[in-house]
Regions:
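Phosphate- and other anionic-substrate recognition elements at nucleic-acid/protein interfaces
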Residues: 1-119
Length: 119
């Protein structure tokens, strides 16, 4: 899955998104020896849906900052009982928001994939 980028807010990132999409379309889906079946464009707000734990209080007004904060907190909760190496890397990272984004997006897209297979 690839995080969908807003075209008007950041056209450079939208271009990079489409380059990545094209690469995986050409090298992945059309290649006979590839295991890639589909390429999903995921809206950035959907990654927070991967978390189904207890509510985390947050009174941050700015939507962007609130989403970053909640993404980090959700990721911390979700990995708490998981891989110790990943937990340490996450705690030490200066880019927790990016790691949390990638993790939550992966969980969300995996959930979608499982739901599609179960239909």
């Amino acid at each position: 899955c690839i995080e969908n980028q807003p075209a008007l807010k950041n056209p450079t990132m939208k271009s990079i998104q489409m380059i990545i999409y094209s690469y995986f379309l050409i090298r992945g889906i059309t290649s006979e020896d590839s295991s890639i079946e589909d390429i999903l464009m995921i809206n950035a707000r959907n990654k927070l849906k991967a978390y189904d734990g207890e509510k985390i209080e947050c009174d941050i007004k700015d939507k962007y900052k609130r989403t970053k904060y909640l993404g980090i907190k959700y990721c911390e909760k979700m990995i708490h009982d998981e891989d110790e190496l990943f937990i340490e890397k996450f705690k030490e990272s200066k880019k927790k928001d990016d790691l949390a984004d990638a993790y939550l997006q992966g969980v969300y897209s995996s959930n979608i994939h499982v739901q599609k297979k179960n239909k």
